[in-house]
Swiss-Prot record:
Role description: Component of the volatile terpenes biosynthesis pathways. Converts mainly geranyllinalool to trimethyltridecatetraene (TMTT).
Cofactors named for this entry: heme
Organism of derivation: Zea mays
Residues the record lists as binding heme: C464
Entry EC no(s): 1.14.14.58
Location in or out of the cell: Membrane
Protein name: Trimethyltridecatetraene synthase
Gene Ontology CC terms: membrane
Membrane topology classification: Single-pass membrane protein
Annotated metabolic or biological route of this protein: Secondary metabolite biosynthesis; terpenoid biosynthesis
PROSITE patterns assigned to the protein according to its UniProt record, in alphabetical order: CYTOCHROME_P450
Transmembrane segments: 1-21
Inducers of expression: Strongly induced in response to herbivory-mediated wounding.
Length: 554
């Protein structure tokens, strides 16, 4: 039987079964938000699998049907919020009703049975995870404790670019992604394991992360939306997820075993290099919490942190932290190269505040309003997760007079909201950091979930718990790249020639990697650390030369 005939049979059976089982006259019709009519079985999935990325396709549909829109996506109702007002209703007014996550293969397979941070359903385990993130993993104290690590990796990134000077253009994302991955690995799993980056094992892990982002972000995975076809795994997505999980599980098991051995050495009074409490990373914190849970009888099984939970947490931290920061920095540099006057303004601010005798530190960031505006404007135009992570309606809810049935998928199109003329009347599609400066319309707008016209990290209960760390990584990254190098496009390339096409997945990165020329503009010893570093007035970052040199290998 041909594939076309098989599909026709499936469609026919589906239509007959729906007709027979439909509750005609037995229930009150739902007052659903307006939206497009879909096809049998697939609903409006075809509109999301076309040439346009899903967030752009949904924005075009919302322009016709309204800011609160209903679609039938496979077997599910889906409601899409595409304005600041409707986002406020979904993420604040009815936050609790939509605080759940849909059950997906990514959560079941890739997140060790929903044991991570991102895909965890609303309930006791999620409350434990949220508290853990707020008080242990991403608290201000914990984030600040890794400031030295972040500064060292920023110097290493600058050194890598410095060594490329005079050799022509560089692929920006390759350098930034390498530094970001090492940074996150050092914070999450320790110096020893971050050192594998560039080795065959490290390269395999990086490729695994890239493939995981591609496969878990596939909107066209039919089994996710039509569960009764899921067992067929038509596109092989679940099979790929299982293979990827096996690969990174081996890596994580080695890491956890190594941390167990470190703890044993401490208990026996024979600590080795890197075994002190000052060298503890996030895995050390998580394993300590596993032990505490085991010794606490009141901890229920539903909220207990386990070894698999530790691996799921680490995977979410490493994958999410690396991808989001690197992608955002590359978009920021792309926009600056397309607007040379904005690049000059950013450089002038850095020269005025920092000078040419030292690098930018995180303590300097509050004094760099234009750099902050560049980052906000980049996140407005290029949110890494343009539809956020889908929400799941825990109960039937009425939103703006419309019914949202229990079990519906709820999406917030933050990409459309950030380009909505109602919220951004001044050229919403243009890159204008000035809109966030004092005296401008966006001066008071922040990215931390209080202003619904700008939601790169979401808002409410399911807001990204690592937004504070992400802002430090991205803002310091952009500041040091602009401060340390004079950037220009390759010869013969004009600003308008820079492609801004997107590649949609779990994150939305550039389809064409940014290539540019980076010319050092600071004294050479700042890149090579050949002279003893000096204590920076007002900064706790000193002696950055203790970081072992490495080369970014791709």
């Amino acid at each position: 039987m041909s594939a076309a005939v098989a599909l026709a049979v499936i469609l026919a059976v589906y239509v007959v079964l729906r007709y027979i089982s439909s509750p005609r006259g037995r229930s009150k019709p739902l007052n659903l938000p307006p939206g497009p009519r879909g096809w049998p079985v697939i609903g409006s999935l075809g509109a999301l699998a076309g040439a346009l990325p899903p967030h752009r396709a949904l924005a075009a549909l919302a322009a016709r049907h309204g800011p609160l829109m209903h679609l039938r996506l496979g077997s599910y109702h889906a409601v899409v919020a595409s304005s600041a007002d409707t986002a406020r209703l979904v993420l604040k007014v009815h936050d609790l009703a939509f605080a759940d996550r849909p059950r997906t293969a990514a959560g079941e397979v890739a997140s060790y049975g929903y044991l991570g941070i991102v895909h965890t359903p609303y309930g006791a385990y999620w409350r434990m995870a949220r508290k853990l993130c707020a008080t242990e993993l991403f608290s201000a104290r914990r984030v600040d404790s890794f400031e030295r690590v972040r500064a060292q990796e920023m110097r290493a990134l600058a050194r890598g670019l410095f060594e490329c000077a005079g050799r022509g253009a560089v692929a920006v994302r390759e350098h930034v992604a390498g530094a970001t991955l090492r940074n996150i690995l050092r914070m999450a799993v320790g110096e020893k394991w971050s050192g594998c980056y560039g080795s065959p094992e490290g390269e395999a892990f990086r490729r695994t992360l890239d493939e995981a982002f591609a496969v878990t972000g596939a909107v066209s995975n039919v089994g996710e939306w039509v569960p009764w076809l899921g067992w067929l795994d038509l596109q092989g997505c679940v099979r790929r997820m299982k293979r990827l999980r096996a690969q990174y599980d081996r890596f994580f098991e080695q890491i956890l075993d190594d941390h167990d051995h470190k703890k044993t050495r401490r208990e026996r009074g024979r600590p080795g290099a890197g075994d002190s409490a000052a060298d503890d990373d996030l895995v050390d914190v998580l394993l300590r919490l596993v032990e505490e849970d085991e010794d606490r009888p009141e901890t229920t099984e539903a909220s207990r942190l386990t070894r698999d939970g530790v691996k799921a947490f680490v995977q979410d931290i490493v994958a999410g932290g690396t991808e989001s920061s690197a992608v955002t920095i590359e978009w920021a540099m792309s926009e600056l190269l397309r607007r040379p006057d904005a690049l000059r303004a950013a450089t002038a601010e850095l020269d005025r505040v920092i000078g040419h005798g030292r690098w930018v530190t995180e303590r300097d960031l509050p004094d760099l309003p234009y750099i902050d505006a560049v980052v906000k404007e980049t996140m407005r135009l290029h949110p890494v997760g343009p539809l956020l992570v889908p929400h799941h309606a825990r109960e039937h809810t009425v939103v703006a007079g419309y019914d949202v049935p229990a079990g519906a998928r709820v999406l917030v199109n933050v990409w459309a909201i950030a380009r909505d003329p109602a919220s951004w009347p001044d050229a919403p599609d243009a890159f204008r950091p000035e809109r966030f400066l004092n005296g401008s319309s966006g001066a008071s707008v922040d990215v931390r979930g209080a202003h619904f016209e700008l939601l790169p990290f979401g808002a409410g209960r399911r807001m990204c718990p690592a937004h504070g760390l992400a802002m430090k990584l991205v803002t310091a990254g952009v500041a040091n790249l602009v401060h340390g190098f004079a950037w220009r496009l390759p010869d013969g390339m004009a600003p308008e020639d820079v492609s801004m096409e997107e590649l949609f997945g779990l994150s939305t990165r550039r389809k064409v990697p940014l290539v540019a020329v980076a010319e050092p503009r600071l004294p050479a010893h700042l890149y090579t650390n050949v002279t003893p570093p000096q204590q920076v007035a007002g900064s706790t970052i000193a002696n950055l030369s203790t970081r072992p040199e490495y080369k970014l290998v791709f």
